[in-house]
């Protein structure tokens, strides 16, 4: 593992995880793609037994704030969610109805070899102050990127759960 990418598991901390689409391409720019991600995340939450404290799905990256799962490690969650989402979204593109134009996963005329970047960033959240800091950071992300004017307008985050405003797409644990 490269220097500076150590992972600390087994301490009971929450994990603030960031991972990106391949080459930071906006492969999650469509609402349908973000919906697929959220559905798969909800399924894995149940299967692996981790607590989902917060999340935001952006067009080219994702932030999660999770506990360590009962089965596996946070890296197991990432491995499974990345695999499932990539398979579903690639399958969807291949199975477009006859007569409908299908755009391959490619950028600049070059075939796309991967859906996700191989690595991910994992920060141990060891205090309530850090938990709030990371939640505020992720919930502000769509506004900071000028995708929306207010977090309530970006349903692919846990902001609606904490404010009780808007739609909650996946159950949040507190």
Tell me the role of every PLM-derived stretch.
Residues 1-174:
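Short catalytic/metal-binding and nucleic-acid-binding patches
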